[in-house]
Amino acid sequence: ITYIPNIIFTILLIFSVWFFRRNILFLKRNILLGRDIDRNDQKKKRWIKMLRIAIGQSKMVKKPVSGVLHIVVYAGFIIMNIELLEIITDGILGTHRAFAPYLGNFYNFIISFFEIFAGLIILAVILFWARRNIIKLKRFIKPEMEGWPKKDANLILYFELVLMTFFLLMNVTDSLLQDANHPQYLKAGSFPISSLLKPVFSSLSIESLIILERIFWWAHITGIFIFLNYLYYSKHLHIILAFP
């Protein structure tokens, strides 16, 4: 019985990766219908341009406010996804914070770094949503931006907001269980952002905290799998296709 969550997680992971691969193969098939182009020339120039635009987000910084917000969300999401390595390891093996014993104090730094970026992403997403739906900047209310483009953009923002919120909620319940010296929750990590939420959960029983921590953990990783496969249907697929 103790292995059931591991089995369920592994099945979920395999299905998510399979479905993503299936969609990517469809996309590849459609791309290959086009005429082949030789792009082996100017390799250095092409690599520099890719790094500048895809990683450096040079096109976005032409507009200072939206540029900074884009960089925060983009860089933050890439950095945040590093924690997926540990979550996947924990999910398959049934461990908890599997990397903590090997990284020592550096692990505390990494988790605090993730939390700060999660907070910045939440702030940036709220500002993005307000600019699009409350302030209604001119470029967002053009006819071509109505319908699916608007809905898609908002869905991406909701995804990011919910994923980062679940990440912080997972951490705050985890840290409270660490404070209670629960044997299954290793004392590891530094939580500068989620610790602000401790008063909300501090009155709950140990059993309730364990249930909530597991709910938030499963919601976070399941949401990531759903988001990964939603990208195929979104204009934000360029997040992946911006790289060679």
Regions found by a protein language model. Give the residues of each.
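Membrane-embedded alpha-helical bundles of multi-pass integral membrane proteins
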Residues: 1-244
